[in-house]
Amino acid sequence: MFSEFVSSFDKHNEVLIASAPIAFEKWNAFLLELFQKPRVKKKVKQKLIIPRRLKKFGLQREKFKPIEIRYSDVEMESEFGVCGDLTYFLSVGDKPYALLIKDRNFASTQKKIFEIMWMAAKN
């Protein structure tokens, strides 16, 4: 799922991610290597919402430009990301699983939800 999402990166698209705490706690090294580096190489802009208590992970990502990061007091049990027509949902509990949906309308709706969350989050 992640490889398909990452391979869709295009410098004309923007990656939007509302993250879950457990993703950083369990998979930080994976995310930096297999997600951030290809995004930077392709010069794809990212907006990332991180739980405030995990600000140290946001500070690590500031070097992976272009990126904008905001911090939220709301912590979610799952995360979602949008790029182009692709949307993923990742549930990272005891039995992690993910959904990847390719649909323009669905992606457009999730982008709007992300923007509402973005406006509520702080720098």
Regions found by a protein language model. Give the residues of each.
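PLD/PLD-like phosphodiesterase catalytic module centered on the HKD motif
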Residues: 22-123
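Interdomain hinge/linker segments and adjacent boundary elements that couple functional modules
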Residues: 1-27, 36
